[in-house]
């Protein structure tokens, strides 16, 4: 039977969980070094799917675990690994997930961070279960001087991997771009997942005046800042890399319960329904939008009937105020129609440009509104970034 998420639980979760997981394997994150991977390899830390437990699963090295688990340490020191973020950016928080590690979780952890100008050539290949770092690997990683990286999370006591204690949320206040983190566990043990929540930070200095850029993309600093419903998939999935792998890699809402018993359509073939769902994104850089892509890939029996896109320009203070009010309708921004309501198709890539779009000038935020409900796998907002001077003149 499904477990209902109560409102109290939702409110107690930190806000940074709405941001993007910059280290997820689907975003290009990878573990480039680990001191020890005897029971389970460190690459498992970055899996997108939730951890699982199979009671009967064993390997020749011991109990199979869906995470990173080191051997019981019998030499001086502690275990650690280095994660290369798939999307460099500003980190706002971590989820150190100990799911299913109940008698074997790492009791303490700390995290360090840095921004490297060049990506190191260090890499871990293949299944490393039952292995430890070799002397040559230790020698290579020593060149990174990771022990002197900035400590963004001090040594922190972790909780066991039971359902009510497994998520160890760690907020961060570090306003600098990060490319790599060093994840330290003390002295040894297991961690199921490590999620690095933040916002991508792109160098826009060389982009102005060039080709169109996907202003909302995860890699370009786009971020979801509000939504009405995320029952089956978070809206942030829509700005991920490449095409969606499946429905779970997109945004899907629950079925609205206010749907009419008998559905009717207007002269344009769009269903007349009282309700809708929405998701709001801050663009990675303000810009003038000239093309929009809406992809319902994989959504065949559950795509929205229609979709529209709205846009506006907000200051940081205005955005924070609206987030605090959860974008309530009585304090909503002045949204302008960018893309009028469009009839959607199943499992289809919809592209809109030219006369299909309404010129709104430079904008910083977009709102997708779907009716009555359903799922979309990808959102692309193509445009040309504008300077801060152009935005100020508009405001």
Curated annotation (Swiss-Prot):
Keyword Ribonucleoprotein: no
GO terms of biological process kind: allantoin catabolic process; purine nucleobase metabolic process
Keywords: Hydrolase, Purine metabolism
Protein origin, superkingdom: Eukaryota
UniProt EC number: 3.5.3.4
GO molecular function: allantoicase activity
A family per Pfam: Allantoicase
Catalytically driven reaction(s): allantoate + H2O = (S)-ureidoglycolate + urea
Pathway membership, UniProt: Nitrogen metabolism; (S)-allantoin degradation; (S)-ureidoglycolate from allantoate (aminidohydrolase route): step 1/1
Stated family: Belongs to the allantoicase family.
Cited function: Utilization of purines as secondary nitrogen sources, when primary sources are limiting.
UniProt name for this protein: Allantoicase
């Amino acid at each position: 039977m499904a477990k209902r998420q109560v409102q109290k639980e939702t409110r107690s979760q930190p806000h940074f969980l709405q941001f993007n997981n910059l280290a997820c394997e689907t975003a290009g994150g990878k573990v480039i070094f680990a001191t020890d991977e005897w029971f389970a390899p460190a690459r498992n830390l970055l899996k997108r799917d939730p951890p699982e437990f199979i009671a009967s699963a064993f390997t020749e090295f011991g109990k199979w675990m869906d995470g990173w688990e080191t051997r019981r340490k019998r030499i001086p020191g502690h275990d650690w690994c280095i994660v290369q973020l798939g999307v460099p950016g500003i980190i706002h928080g971590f989820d150190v997930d100990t799911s299913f590690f109940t008698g074997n979780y790492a009791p303490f952890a700390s995290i360090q961070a840095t921004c490297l100008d060049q990506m190191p050539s260090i890499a871990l290949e293949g299944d490393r279960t039952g292995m430890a770092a070799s002397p040559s690997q230790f020698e290579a990683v020593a060149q990174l001087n990771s022990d002197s990286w900035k400590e963004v999370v001090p040594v922190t006591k972790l909780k066991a991997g039971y359902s009510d204690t497994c998520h160890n949320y760690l907020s961060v206040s570090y306003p600098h771009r990060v490319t790599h983190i060093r994840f330290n566990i003390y002295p040894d043990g297991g961690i199921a997942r490590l999620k690095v929540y933040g916002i991508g930070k792109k160098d826009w200095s060389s982009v102005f005046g060039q080709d169109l850029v996907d202003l909302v993309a995860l890699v370009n600093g786009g971020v979801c800042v509000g939504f009405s419903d995320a029952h089956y998939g978070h809206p942030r999935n829509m700005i991920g890399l490449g095409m969606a792998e499946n429905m779970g890699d997109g945004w899907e809402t629950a079925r609205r319960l206010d749907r009419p018993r008998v559905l009717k359509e207007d002269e344009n073939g769009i269903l007349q329904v009282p309700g809708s769902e929405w998701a709001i994104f801050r663009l990675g850089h303000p810009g003038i939008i000239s093309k929009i892509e809406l992809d319902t890939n994989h959504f065949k029996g559950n795509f929205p009937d229609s979709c529209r896109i709205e846009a506006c320009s907000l200051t940081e203070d205005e955005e924070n105020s609206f987030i605090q009010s959860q974008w309530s309708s009585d304090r909503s921004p002045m949204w302008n129609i960018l893309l009028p309501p469009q009839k959607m198709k199943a499992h289809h890539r919809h592209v809109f440009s030219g006369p299909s779009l309404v010129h709104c000038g430079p904008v910083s935020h977009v709102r997708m509104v779907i009716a009555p409900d359903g799922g979309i796998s990808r959102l692309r907002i193509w445009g040309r970034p504008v300077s801060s001077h152009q935005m100020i003149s508009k405001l």
